[in-house]
Swiss-Prot record:
GO biological process terms held by the UniProt record: L-histidine biosynthetic process; L-tryptophan biosynthetic process
The protein's name: 1-(5-phosphoribosyl)-5-[(5-phosphoribosylamino)methylideneamino] imidazole-4-carboxamide isomerase
Pfam families: His_biosynth
Gene3D superfamilies given in the database record: Aldolase class I
Pathway: Amino-acid biosynthesis; L-histidine biosynthesis; L-histidine from 5-phospho-alpha-D-ribose 1-diphosphate: step 4/9
Amino acid sequence: MLIIPAIDLKDGACVRLRQGRMEDSTVFSDDPVSMAAKWVEGGCRRLHLVDLNGAFEGQPVNGEVVTAIAKRYPTLPIQIGGGIRSLDTIEHYVKAGVSYVIIGTKAVKQPEFVAEACKAFPGKVIVGLDAKDGFVATDGWAEVSSVQVIDLAKRFEADGVSAIVYTDIAKDGMMQGCNVPFTKALAEATRIPVIASGGIHNLGDIKALLDAKAPGIVGAITGRAIYEGTLDVAEAQAFCDNYQG
């Protein structure tokens, strides 16, 4: 299982939100490229970037920062989400050296777009499913739909999606542990690899994900925990690598 540091971008700075609320943000650095360097030097094998402004505005806003990070680390797999709602945007990011694009809102509102994107950019598409009480949320989590996460995930199995990033909104940024039972249920219900996100606080939460014994859980995204020092990236990755269960 990969430990994936998150860099959330708002107005060019690296921030963390609580439960997806833009008004409840903490600025951790005004130099996201240096922040990326910190996690790379700490041994991370993939980075998770989110354009928060883009998620709310429906188009990339912090694209220059994303490109700068991708250029600095050309061999590091980078995934970007937030405001990706057109093939042109995906093409822009892929040309900039980004490994994966995460389609969120558009995947819920227009699922056929995912198949289109997978066909145009094979192996590059991840679907981001953000949920509240098992139902998918969209538009920077401002709207909660009547669509169930597992039902939607199954719909994408035939499209060639590389992974699903599953985030429990109630947990995100709260550092109270992630929703292990639902993450496990999702991983077991679909053939698509699942990356857990939201609520990871410490090594105990990483162990809980591993203890779930769901081979489909291939990664864990962590944000506030690594910024506030309750989780160490290198230690957590070593723990995953050496886990015997």
